[in-house]
Amino acid sequence: MHNETSKRKIPIFPEITSSKDLIAYLDSSERLNKRKYLYHYTTIRNAIAIFKSGTWHLGNPRDMNDVVEYRNGDQQRWNNIFFASFMAENKESIAMWSMYSQPWKDGVKIAIPMSTMKEWLKGIDEILEVSPTNYELTGKSIPVNERNTIHISSVAYSNTASCDSSGDSETLMWSNQKNTKIPNCQQLSELTGYIKDNAWDYEKEVRLKAEFENTFGYSRVAVKIPNSILNEITISSGPLFEGDLLQRMEYELNRSFHTDQSFFAG
């Protein structure tokens, strides 16, 4: 499905007029060609869990912090979408530290080279069910194929909510580009999972998505992340991280790591 759209000639972002072309544009790996890394802001506890389990969990949108996006999306489509969020912006973000790496004393940032991310995606062959109560694997899974997909997609940002009161024209934004040719984009069911309000545009979000017909009623899933990929990850301590990051990680996992620290650390 996503490979087919990537082969079509896609208009430049300002000239896109259809949901189909917008989805193809945001799903295209070309959007990330200039990005060296994708970043995931989290806590040391979650980072350790990823390394211990050799899996990366993808949550259901019902549990995300943007209730406006969930409300605007199609509820049936949401049932079939799971994702983990990354930031495509190389510049370090205090806003992201504040939102996702709390408490401050435990905040870390995971950096995955873009080439490593693409290699990881190619090797994922199944989607694993995760228990919503204890977050452990249930032993159930579905294969990755044309119907059950794993891919990365960018998020576009809309000013629909704010333009109603300000009188501005409705505008969709991705990176530094603007589009005014897809009206009411946040209300289009087929764009569920692709559009957020521009209040969130500082996140420069890229999503690792699993999409499938959720006939089994999965509420949380995971994908395997092998050691060859984990070995390429760099973990940075946050601005107010307490203790020695490398010592804390090695104590828990008994392995070596690539580590760094926040630009804003004292």
Where are these regions (language model features)?
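NAD-dependent ADP-ribosyltransferases
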Residues: 1-266
